[in-house]
Amino acid sequence: MAAKSDGGGVGVGFAQLHNLDEAVGSGEEDGEPGGGGCGGGDGSEPGESSSLHICHCCNTSSCYWGCRSACLRSLLGKKPRRSAAAADGGDQPLQPPGAAGRHPPTPSAGRPQPASPQVERPWLDCLWIVLALLVFFGDVGTDLWLALDYYRKGDYGCFGLTLFFVLVPSLLVQSLSFRWFVQDYTGGGLGAVEGLSSRGPPMMGAGYGHGAARGGPGAGGSATPGAQRLCRLSVWIWQSVIHLLQMGQVWRYIRTMYLGIQSQRQKEHQRRFYWAMMYEYADVNMLRLLETFLESAPQLVLQLCIMIQKNSAETLPCVSSVTSLMSLAWVLASYHKLLRDSRDDKKSMSYRGALIHLFWRLFTISSRVISFALFASIFQLYFGIFVVVHWCAMAFWIIHGGTDFCMSKWEEILFNMVVGIVYIFCWFNVKEGRTRYRMFAYYTIVLTENAALTFLWYFYRNPESTDSYAVPALCCVFVSFVAGITLMLLYYGVLHPMGPRAKVFASSCCAELLWGIPLPPDVEPMAPQTPGYRGTQVTPTRAVTEQQEDLTADTCLPVFQVRPMGPSTPSGRPYHPEGPLIKIDMPRKRYPAWDAHFVDRRLRRTINILQYVTPTAVGIRYRDGPLLYELLQYESSL
């Protein structure tokens, strides 16, 4: 990889990361204004600066303790450094070297601001994550409770199967989560950056070194080797304990919420916190998707099959089945919402659309699972054969369709085989383009299979033990399927972000949050603006009128999303921020695949290291995309 300038900023390569001492030294000679320390060395309040700068506690580009001022060394000596900083003038805002004459204009320098301040609603996004945590705890907790109940009753067969479908998927997912942590925290990921200046990064200004010399705000910036080892060891111990306790996903959810809140509090580093949150949220959603179809789906079929065989529906197995079903539907809705939110070439899914999506999945999966349980209660061997045949057919269909998710051919085939497991239970879009014909074919096959499995059970069942629920079970299978398809048509016809819904503009905060009305851009997409203030949402693929802009000017926006606005210079021209671009020398993957910098840990490492070097922000661009993917500030080739 190499990094180069596009003419708007200073070219920086990875080799230059080893010469930051010289960069700081040259800044000192020029007498540039200084700033505070990094990694808690400035004694600033939590959240005053980005947690994505180099942490001088552990010499890494990501501090896993959260905000940089919440590092261990900062917590130990926070008050003395704060008083020294106040006496030395160290409480001034941090400024990058040479930035005095090129700061982006404030909101007052742009277009006129609304008379009433915009009301942000962090509760909606926080509530979504809190509900995801509750669904997770409810699913796993009821399964463990049910396994313990089987053990107390002496039903060791059901106890073993129930516990197996809880522990094995959890161990696999926690191993993958810990592997991602290792990649992000070592040289293979975000990594320890060798050769960093102990006096602080150049973006902190030359005063950092002078402050350290006189006991000012930079005095804590030089971490001794022992302190660095202690901090890194504490991070490793913390993450190891978290994953051994099978709580890796819980930690990622909490960290996602923290970064999202910080993206709203910290206007100076809003973009960095926002994308750190997007990376973390993407990771936890992919982990949850994998665990759900390895744990919740088999668990749901197992418990329904046990209840049918025993001809009894006790409270605890029913609760476990309901939570497993809810977990499946929730994860699918959350995954698709996040995938759309992460792509600038697609409109975001509203919360109303996500809710309808959730119930669509809830009903179709219910129909599928009930038919599975009915058939498996009599034909266990044939049910296993059916599942294997269906999985092979779906995997072949997906491979034949030509997906574009992974970097290599064999990884793509493995991914398609995993998606084939998802196709056993529900539809999962993996290819760009119109999906109506593929969905019609899939749901026709599913309806045929559900009907065949259910009627085979009905004709071969024991009438004496099943007459009480045979007809209601048949009704459940077909009514649930029809309800799910109806909700799917409602979603695609009315609530889909690109669907033919009514052209209604948001007139209130609630309407905007629920409908997800896209806001018009102020400037051309090729000149993305510095974020940090709530203005308009860049939607490069859709032209809008000035009337639409006036209608949406006073609405509030969903939190945890950076909405760039286009401030103007006194001359009336759009402000073009300085700085190079991240240029990824590979074609951009088509929707519904993730962008490469979400799934490729090397690209994440590149972005985070480049993010450390220069504070200005411009954008990211893929090789075949004429539009800028708004993110950071460099042009890098892979």
Swiss-Prot record:
GO terms for biological process: apoptotic process involved in development; engulfment of apoptotic cell; phosphatidylserine exposure on apoptotic cell surface. The keyword Acetylation does not apply. Residues 33-43 have a biased composition (Gly residues). Keywords: Cell membrane, Membrane, Transmembrane, Transmembrane helix. Pfam families: XK-related (PF09815). It is a multi-pass membrane protein. Residues 24-43, 82-117 are annotated as: Disordered. The chain crosses the membrane at residues 127-147, 158-178, 315-335, 369-389, 410-430, 439-459, 470-490. It is found in: Cell membrane. Its main location: membrane. GO terms for cellular component: plasma membrane. Belongs to the XK family. This is XK-related protein 6. It comes from Rattus norvegicus. The gene is Xkr6.
